[in-house]
Amino acid sequence: EFGLTPPEHMVRATDFIPQQLALVRTLKEKGYTYQTSDGIYFDTSKFPRYADFAQLDLAAQKAGARVEANSEKRQPWDFALWKFTEPGKRRDMEWETPEDLLDSHGRETPGAASGAAGVIMGFPGWHLECSTMAMELLGQTIDIHTGGIDHIPVHHTNEIAQSEAASGVQFARYWLHCNHLKIDGGKISKSLGNGLSVLDLLQGTLNDILDAGLQAGVLHRIYEAQVGLSVPSH
């Protein structure tokens, strides 16, 4: 419909669970991880360049402003590589945590749900899957990494930390951060119920803004510019 070139790889994070666990294993072997009652975390103090990419002032950071507070974390901005399923709960997507990834107390980890034979069930942290898939498909150093500007201080910062800590080389040569698309002057948000999909734009009364509005106004704009889209009320 839009004349866009499809990606060479259409991947799912769940297809890369063994590789994600292997990345956690590498980070553990290199001394970058530690374990709490709810998961395995990346120790950002072991990665001196952690704040450089987003020019973060870590001394002024408050845990709640960027990440969920966890009193067991060594630094508020340390992030989960692998989370343990909560006791008494079962997730739609969870996997066995390999015993060699656990600390010496292993299966006695408090606060973690156990499966058959006391195996601790878990799931990947938010950032782990992206680094894993990128390095598996594109190599340890990729040419261009894109994403939204809102990912700079947390997601992309954490991707860089875990990827470069594991590989020892630069993760991405260039970063292209896209600005936000706004609708009628406001942000697009699930909570506001104002989201529009491409399918919405292709159907019904929105066709009149599709060709000129979407292609010229969105797809052909400078990637770092904020774009506004007005939706007809009829």
Q: What kind of region is each of these model predictions?
A:
Residues 2-13:
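Divalent metal-dependent hydrolysis catalytic cores, especially in the metallo-beta-lactamase
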Residues 6, 18-228:
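Alpha-helical recognition segments enriched in aromatics with Gly/Pro capping
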